[in-house]
């Protein structure tokens, strides 16, 4: 992170969290959940420049793309959303793009917060059906 934060360059940051993974593990077993994560990670890796995707938790990933134009970054995000746009498994995505890496920690916090808001919205939409817990 330090290597980016000193640069005066554009940067896109995204947090991705796979919604419904616990339910998939409970219903189909952890092998199915692991396969989903491996497949999803491979798809994400093919969607972003090499070396910019990081797994930060069980089902959480972060993307940090320096030197990327805003339109290109939005295309990357849309491709990721489309990949995980399934009723049984959607990804919560929060992202930020900025002209400067100077305040990278604040950008990361904002993208993370937006991901949690997206995740909460997903679970609220499915709460009445009793489909998901978190």
What are these regions (language model features)?
Residues 74-81, 85, 96-134:
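Catalytic-core segments of nucleotide cyclases and related cyclic-nucleotide turnover enzymes
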Residues 63-68, 97-99:
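Short beta-strand-to-loop capping motifs
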Residues 14, 64, 94:
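Conserved Rossmann-like nucleotide-binding pocket used by diverse enzymes
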Residues 11, 28, 94-96, 125:
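Flexible, nucleotide-binding loop/lid elements of kinase catalytic cores
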Residues 1-12, 19-46, 54-58, 62-63, ...:
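Conserved long alpha-helical elements within nucleotide-processing catalytic cores of c-di-GMP signaling
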């Amino acid at each position: 992170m330090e290597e980016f934060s000193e640069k005066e360059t554009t940067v896109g940051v995204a947090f991705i969290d796979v919604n419904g993974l616990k339910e998939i593990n409970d219903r189909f077993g952890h092998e199915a959940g692991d396969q989903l994560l491996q497949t999803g990670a491979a798809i994400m890796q093919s969607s972003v420049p090499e070396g910019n995707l990081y797994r930060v938790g069980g089902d959480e990933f972060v993307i940090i793309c320096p030197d990327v134009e805003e339109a290109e970054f939005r295309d990357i995000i849309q491709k990721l959303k489309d990949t995980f746009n399934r009723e049984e498994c959607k990804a919560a995505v929060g992202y930020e793009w900025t002209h400067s890496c100077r305040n990278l920690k604040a950008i990361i916090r904002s993208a993370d917060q937006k991901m949690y808001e997206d995740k909460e919205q997903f679970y609220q939409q499915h709460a009445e059906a009793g489909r998901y817990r978190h």
